[in-house]
């Protein structure tokens, strides 16, 4: 029977992480459990930087972006000797289980700790929406709103100058954020990691649009596919249309979480504690068809590639 739990946020921050921490803390306290917050993710676990949390520790946190516990990327945590020190720190505090909020890298750490005797439940927190076992991740909808607002602003200036604008969106190997933002923002062209990309083909599509009378256009592209500044120069040379690239960058991770992210994070935080109380470990929570679900972290990591929303792309192309 667990009496104390710890909670940490790891990897890239995402709007709604504070709401998830709040969900964990308030639910645990309602079940008469003690809760410890761990600063800066697995790094704080290794350095033994923890603090006991009460209900007031998470007051006025549901609407705040980022994570008040801090986060860090700590590659050394993959080393057995580093994790052993972290486990010792957990045991010194008599913490019985952990809730880990983050992306796939955080999942790996949680699985390793579970295998070392520390029960863990993971919550998907990343704007990339690239974690399997869930329809949506915490932070995705807020980032989507941010990207669409940026596209709206770019369209204002692009239309004024009859310009082609390229907007680079986060997502790593997953195009969910780019695709959804492109549909909502009315982008004329979409470049995703899930589909074959050739700059020559993109130019042909753009030229076809110009031939139809298109005076300006927005190209939405997921990060890491190509150098967008070089792409802008190439498009401008081939089309004789002024072309500019905008990299949205880390602004996509900031800001107060939108309503859906607050609700999702609160539900996932509460559900993770409920699973620990029932004796589950090595699980990751998710939402599917608006219902809370859980899967083995190990299975989620084996099947990390999400199903590509091909039907969304087909719809988007019809709307050009």
Curated annotation (Swiss-Prot):
EC numbers on record? 2.7.1.11
Q: Where in the cell is it found?
A: Cytoplasm
Activation and inhibition: Allosterically activated by ADP and other diphosphonucleosides, and allosterically inhibited by phosphoenolpyruvate.
Q: List the disulfide bonds.
A: none
Where it mainly occurs, coarsely classed, is cytoplasm
Residues reported in the UniProt entry to bind ADP: 22-26, 55-60, 155, 186-188, 212, 214-216
Under the heading SUPFAM superfamilies, the entry gives: Phosphofructokinase
Under the GO molecular function aspect, what terms does this record hold?
Answer: 6-phosphofructokinase activity; AMP binding; ATP binding; fructose-6-phosphate binding; identical protein binding; metal ion binding; monosaccharide binding
Q: Show the active-site residues.
A: 128
Q: Which GO terms describe its cellular component?
A: 6-phosphofructokinase complex
Which UniProt key words apply to this protein? Allosteric enzyme, ATP-binding, Cytoplasm, Glycolysis, Kinase, Magnesium, Metal-binding, Nucleotide-binding, Transferase
Q: What does the record give as cofactor?
A: Mg(2+)
Q: Which Gene3D superfamilies match?
A: 3.40.50.450, Phosphofructokinase domain
Which reactions appear under catalytic activity for this entry?
beta-D-fructose 6-phosphate + ATP = beta-D-fructose 1,6-bisphosphate + ADP + H(+)
Give the EC class as a word. transferase
- Residues reported in the UniProt entry to bind Mg(2+): 104
**Residues annotated for ATP binding in this entry:** 12, 73-74, 103-106
| Quaternary structure, from the entry | Homotetramer.
Write out the function statement from the record.
Catalyzes the phosphorylation of D-fructose 6-phosphate to fructose 1,6-bisphosphate by ATP, the first committing step of glycolysis.
Which NCBIfam families does the record match to this protein? PFKA_ATP, PRK03202.1
Q: Give the record's family classification.
A: Belongs to the phosphofructokinase type A (PFKA) family. ATP-dependent PFK group I subfamily. Prokaryotic clade 'B1' sub-subfamily.
Q: Which HAMAP family match?
A: Phosphofructokinase_I_B1 (MF_00339)
Query: What name goes with this protein?
Result: ATP-dependent 6-phosphofructokinase
Q: Which organism is it from?
A: Buchnera aphidicola subsp. Acyrthosiphon pisum (strain APS)
List the lineage, top down: Bacteria, Pseudomonadati, Pseudomonadota, Gammaproteobacteria, Enterobacterales
Q: Point out the gene that encodes the protein.
A: pfkA
């Amino acid at each position: 029977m667990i009496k104390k739990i710890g909670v940490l946020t790891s990897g890239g921050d995402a709007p709604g992480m504070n709401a998830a921490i709040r969900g964990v803390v308030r639910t645990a306290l309602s079940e008469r459990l003690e809760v410890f917050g761990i600063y800066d993710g697995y790094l704080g676990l290794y350095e033994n930087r923890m603090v006991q949390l009460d209900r007031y520790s998470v007051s006025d946190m549901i609407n705040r972006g980022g994570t008040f516990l801090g986060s860090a990327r700590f590659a050394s945590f993959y080393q057995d000797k580093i994790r052993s020190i972290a486990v010792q720190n957990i045991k010194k505090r008599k913490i019985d289980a952990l809730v880990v909020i983050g992306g796939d890298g955080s999942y790996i750490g949680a699985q390793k700790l579970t295998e070392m005797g520390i029960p863990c439940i993971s919550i998907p927190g990343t704007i990339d929406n690239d974690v399997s076992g869930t329809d949506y991740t915490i932070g995705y909808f807020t980032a989507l709103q941010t990207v669409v607002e940026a596209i709206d602003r770019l369209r204002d200036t692009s239309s004024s100058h009859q310009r082609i604008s390229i907007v680079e969106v986060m997502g790593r190997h997953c195009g969910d954020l780019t695709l959804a933002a492109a549909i909502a923002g009315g982008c004329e062209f979409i470049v995703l990691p899930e589909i074959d990309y050739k700059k020559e083909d993109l130019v042909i599509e753009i030229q076809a649009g110009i031939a139809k009378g298109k005076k300006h256009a927005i190209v939405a592209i997921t990060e890491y596919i190509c150098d967008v500044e070089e792409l802008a120069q190439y498009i401008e040379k081939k089309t004789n249309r002024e072309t500019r690239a905008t990299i949205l960058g880390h602004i996509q991770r900031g800001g107060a979480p939108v309503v859906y992210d607050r609700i999702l994070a609160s539900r996932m935080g509460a559900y993770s504690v409920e699973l620990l109380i029932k004796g589950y470990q090595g699980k990751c929570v998710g939402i599917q068809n608006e219902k809370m679900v859980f899967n083995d972290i190990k299975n989620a990591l084996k099947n990390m590639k999400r199903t590509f929303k091909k039907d969304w792309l087909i719809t988007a192309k019809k709307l050009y």
